[in-house]
């Protein structure tokens, strides 16, 4: 509007964005907060900028208890590892199954190393209890030849039309 009338604008382009007090007082992760995040285009950016500026260190870049220094990962590791307790993390029943490329579960017998009688993978069927082969025969045979039913001696007939 200022350009149309020829007058200069008195608005400050460097002024901070006006945020209503009701929006500033919304509790984080409340239903009202979630509604603001999902419906407004500016509120997620505003909320993240407020969390970065906060004194709680939510997004403080490198500032922590040791005066802003880096955390030594070796201090976070335990003194020793007890490998006897690690067996609880591995499920022996789940080790019998292997996922294929299409996300299906394949039964892998220890003696077969994942292969069936003819060398193909064996898929565990969820419907019945017997494993079946991945490679299934085609439902339909190949398309028959176009001129397969004609006699050998007969040639294609030309249609003669008068001029």
Swiss-Prot record:
Identification of the protein by name: Protein EARLY RESPONSIVE TO DEHYDRATION 15
Domain comment (free text): Contains a PAM2-like motif, which seems to be involved in the binding to the PABC/CTC domain of PAB proteins.
Subcellular localization(s) per the UniProt record: Cytoplasm
Keyword Coiled coil in annotation: no
Superkingdom in the source lineage: Eukaryota
GO biological process: cellular response to hypoxia; nonphotochemical quenching; response to bacterium; response to high light intensity; response to water deprivation
Reported tissue expression: Expressed in cauline leaves, stems, rosette leaves, immature siliques and primary inflorescences.
Chief subcellular location: cytoplasm
Function of the molecule: Central component of stress responses that interacts with poly(A)-binding proteins. Negative regulator of abscisic acid (ABA) responses, including resistance to drought and freezing as well as stomatal closure regulation. Mediates resistance to the bacterial necrotroph pathogen Erwinia carotovora subsp. carotovora and promotes the induction of marker genes for systemic acquired resistance (SAR).
Subunit structure and binding partners: Interacts with PAB2, PAB4 and PAB8. Interacts with MPC.
Region annotation (Disordered) ranges: 118-163
Induction (record text): Strongly induced by abiotic stresses such as abscisic acid (ABA), salicylic acid (SA), wounding, high light, cold stress, oxidative stress, hypergravity and dehydration. Accumulates upon root colonization by the plant-growth-promoting rhizobacterium (PGPR) Paenibacillus polymyxa. Slightly reduced levels in response to UV-A illumination, salt stress and heat shock treatment.
Position of sequence motif PAM2-like: 10-20
Keyword terms, alphabetized: Cytoplasm
Consequence of gene loss (knockout): Hypersensitive to abscisic acid (ABA) leading to improved tolerance to both drought and freezing, as well as impaired seed germination in the presence of ABA.
InterPro entries membership: CID1/CID2
Keyword Iron-sulfur attributed: no
Example of a GO cellular component annotation carried by this entry: cytosol
Range of residues in the leader sequence: none
């Amino acid at each position: 509007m200022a350009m149309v009338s020829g007058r200069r604008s008195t608005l400050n382009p460097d002024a901070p964005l006006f945020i209503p007090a009701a929006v500033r007082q919304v509790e984080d992760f409340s239903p009202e907060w979630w509604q603001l995040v999902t419906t407004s285009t500016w509120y997620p950016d505003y909320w993240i900028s407020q969390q970065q500026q906060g004194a709680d260190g939510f997004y403080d870049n490198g500032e922590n208890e040791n005066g802003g220094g880096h955390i030594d990962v070796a201090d976070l590791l335990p003194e020793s590892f007890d490998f006897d307790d690690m067996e609880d993390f591995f499920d022996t029943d789940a080790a019998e199954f292997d996922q294929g490329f299409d996300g299906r579960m394949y039964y892998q017998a220890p003696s077969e190393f994942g292969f069936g009688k003819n060398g193909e993978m064996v898929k565990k069927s969820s419907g019945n209890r017997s494993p079946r082969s991945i490679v299934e025969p085609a439902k339909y045979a190949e398309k028959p030849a176009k001129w397969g039913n004609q006699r050998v001696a007969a040639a294609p007939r030309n249609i003669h039309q008068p001029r």
